Amino acid sequence: MGYGNRRPLRTWVAFTAFFAMVVSAMSPQAEAAPPAGSAAASSYFMYVATYTDGKSKSKGIYSYRFDAKTGKLTPIGLAAEIVNPGWLSTDPTHRFLYAVTERPNERGPGAYTKDGSVSSYAIDPKTGALTFLNKVNSHGGGPCYILVDPTGKTLFLANYGTGSVVSFAIKPDGSIGERISFDQHSGSSVDHARQEGPHAHAAVLSPDHRFLFVPDLGTDQVKIYKVDAVKGTFSPNDPAYVTMKPGLGPRHFTFGKDGRFAYVLCEMGSSVVVFSYDAAKGSLTTIQTAYNLPADFKGIDNSAEIEVDRSGRFLYASNRGHDSITVYAIDPAKGTLTLVQNIPTQGSIPRNFALDPTGKYVVVGNQISNELLVFDVNQKYGTLKPTGEKVDLDEPICIVFVPAA
C-alpha cells in the first residue's frame, strides 16, 4: 500500500520506443480512434485526496477547476476535511463522491490493523462543493480502494491492512447503507516483510459486471468473485483466484477497452502482467509480463497506478522510486504490450495519476515532492510531454474528475 523497500525485477521490455511508435501509428485501430474530447465536456472539477498525518500540511480532499481545452488547473480549495482519504470514487451520475479513511499515523510495517471508514458526499455540479452525507465502518484495517457499480446501488471496498473485501448498499440519497457481503482473504507469500499476510489492494468489476477481481499484494493472487448485480452480493468464483509469480505483489487491475484482456500492475515487481479473459467463466490466463523499468536501474521502486486510455491503444503505469510513467502500446489482436516511452514525472513518488476524460492530458500526483503536474498526451503515439502546468499540494495520493455544469 505504501512505498516499500523491495528491489524490483529489472528486466526491460526488449523493444525501442521508436519501433513502438511506428507500429502504433500503422495499426488500423490507431487510424480509427476518435479524436480526444469529441464527446466530452471541456470543464471539469478535479478532486485530489491527500495524506493528512506526519509532516503533511494537507487536511483532506481538495478541489480544482480543470480546463480540458488548455490543461490548466485552477485551485478552488479544501472541499472536505477528512483524515487520510486514501482513495476516491464517484457514482455513475457524478452526483456523489466516496472516500476511504485510513486511521492517522498508521503508515508503515505492521500498520493498518484497525478498522478504517468510508464517507459519502454530495457534489454540487455548479460549484464543485462537497456536502457530507455519512460515514460507515470499513469492516477492516487500512481501506485502500473503493468502486461504485454501474447501477450506483452498490459500493465495493478493499481493506489492505487486514486483507478483506466488502460490499455496501448505497441509498437513493447517495449515503452508504448496510454491509451486504464480506470475504476475508488468507495466506502469505515469499517476502516476509511485506507479504506476511493478505493485503487486498483493489476491487474491479468485469465489463459485464458479473465478476469482481481483487488483486492481493500479500498472497500474490488475484481473487475472483461472482457478483449478483441486483443484490450487490459476491461469492467466490470457480476458479476462485489466479496465482502470480511469487514476489510480484499485485496492486491494481484494469481491463482493455474491448474486455478481452486484463492488466495487473504489480507493485513489488514493477511490472504489468497481461491476461486473456474468459468472460463466460470469469477466468484469467497469463500471456505476458512486461517490466516497467530500464535494465540498468539499480534503485528501489514500487509501481503504483495503471490506466488504459479511452481509445484502448495505450496503457500507462507509474513507478515510485524510478519516479516515472511507463507508456505501452497495446496490440489490439493479442492484448500484449510494447514499450513506447518511460518519462520522468519531474517529482518524487508518483503514487497516482489520472487521464482526463477527454484523453488529452494526464495529471500526476507526486506524493513526496508535494505537487500536481499536467502532461500532454500525444494522440497518435500515446507519448507524454510536460505542459509546464504545476500546482503545489502536500502528499497528493488520488485524483478523480467530475464534469462541471
Report each predicted region and the residues it spans.
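Asp-box/WD-like beta-propeller blade repeats and closely related beta-sheet repeat scaffolds
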Residues: 129-202
